[in-house]
């Protein structure tokens, strides 16, 4: 089956069960295509409702790959967090229903391809097969402690050329994910920026012979490679939409402050803008 058709078909099946935007899922799918010839399985830390893990399982099946997926989640939400580095993330956030996830797995016919391990990472990882190895990992743990636990387990088991995708790597007000990555993998990371707050890297070497030439930009004292982000038209379109959205948000907020502070009346356009604030469009 054509890879684009595989993506569209399977994204449509899992879209109601993931908080990831379509562009973010596409980026992870591209990583799967890049590492599909490597040995090792796929693993997701922080599977939530199962959408991304099941998407990977569906794609593995359609592409005829000899791989499986392991999904780990506490199903109790986040563990204790550190507000100084984890920002808005708090204990208990992002809890999900284990039975609903298992039901979705059965409905999709993925029992043989996707293993769901319920529990805190420390407990679940201690029960993993000793010979486990991985070519693709999606870390959606959101916070410092969980991300560091996941990376410490993953690094010795990641095959050469394997890809690691970090969600919420650039989440506003939260630096826990990137700090954990730097502590485990080293400060001099080649971070490829993905859609939204996503970044990915190849800790043991980039296997892509046709990878684009780096396009470096700095943010917050760290360097990010934008080449992959700028290579796809849908990513550029998403960036343009986000820029317009946040410009409108900023204008509305300025008008709001004028309103409550008794300054000159806000623009008429701000009332229209308020109807759009908070709507997140999936692309």
For each predicted feature, which ranges?
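S-adenosylmethionine/decaboxylated-SAM
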Residues: 1-22, 29, 36-282
């Amino acid at each position: 089956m054509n890879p684009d058709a595989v993506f569209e078909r399977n994204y449509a099946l899992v879209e109601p069960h993931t908080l990831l935007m379509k562009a973010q899922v596409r980026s992870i799918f591209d990583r799967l295509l890049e590492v599909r010839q490597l040995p090792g399985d796929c693993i997701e830390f922080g599977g939530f409702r199962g959408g991304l893990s099941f998407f990977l399982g569906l794609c593995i099946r359609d592409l005829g790959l000899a791989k499986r997926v392991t999904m780990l989640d506490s199903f109790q939400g986040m563990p204790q967090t550190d507000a100084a580095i984890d920002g808005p993330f708090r204990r208990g956030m992002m809890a999900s229903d284990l039975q609903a996830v298992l039901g979705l797995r059965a409905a999709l016919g993925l029992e043989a391809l996707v293993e769901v391990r319920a529990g805190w990472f420390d407990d679940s990882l201690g029960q993993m097969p000793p010979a486990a190895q991985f070519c693709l990992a999606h870390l959606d743990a959101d916070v410092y402690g969980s991300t560091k636990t996941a990376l410490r387990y993953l690094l010795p088991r990641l095959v050469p050329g394997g890809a690691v995708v970090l969600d919420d790597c650039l989440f506003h007000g939260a630096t826990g994910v990137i700090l954990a990555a730097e502590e485990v993998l080293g400060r001099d990371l080649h971070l490829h920026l993905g859609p939204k707050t996503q970044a990915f890297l190849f800790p043991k070497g980039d296997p892509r012979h046709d990878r684009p030439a780096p396009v470096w930009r700095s943010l917050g004292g760290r360097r990010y490679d934008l080449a992959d982000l700028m290579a796809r038209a849908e990513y550029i379109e998403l960036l343009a939409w986000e820029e317009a959205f946040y410009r409108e948000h900023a204008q509305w907020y300025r008008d709001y402050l004028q309103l409550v502070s008794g300054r000159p009346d806000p623009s008429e356009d701000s009332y229209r803008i308020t109807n759009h604030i908070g709507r997140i469009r999936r692309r």
